[in-house]
Amino acid sequence: MGQRLVVSVQNNGRELATIYYHWSAYTVSALYETETLVKCIFNHKDETEEELKLRLIRFCYENGGGIMGDHFEFEYIRSLYPNEIFKEDGYSRSYGLISISEQGMRESHKWSEGDVIIHIDEERISNGVFGYWDNIQEYNEEVASWGPGYEDDIKVFEDVPDIGYDLGDIEIKDIGKVIKAIENANEHIVRYGNEIYELTE
């Protein structure tokens, strides 16, 4: 079983699509998948949400993924785009399985072990694929509660690298910079100001 990531694409508070990745609910992997989706969404101008959904479906297929779930989702998508040809097999759940029906999106969320939301209208990303503590004291208290053998995990605040970005609320334009900041830190415990993040690895 993988670490299962679900990326939700939303506009004006409405969910348009979910994309499921079977092995990507790790902090950096999730951000890379999200960055690729962001480029797909924002590097083109769609006249309607239906056009955007179709482009996301094509994006999944082009990258080795496909349509999520059972025959219902496939038939639902085919009914919306009768002039398109969608293959029912030969794709991988590791490369993105899309749902756009209400039922399909609900089912996709049930599998999630890590969630990211792309807010198109706000040009922001809500990221939940990391551990969080309000401050270093809370983090160290939790580590101490784990018992003997975890002494090396206790951190001195000044030794924790500040990545300079809120990992839970990212502006679309900054996602590449956030990834680079995390990779440059080269630590699994990082911070933004006083907030402590544990990267899921």
State the predicted function of each range.
Residues M1-E33:
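Short, extreme N-terminal segment that most often corresponds to the first beta-strand
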Residues V28-E33, L37-H44:
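N-terminal interaction modules that seed assembly of large macromolecular complexes
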Residues K39-E201:
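Low-complexity intrinsically disordered segments
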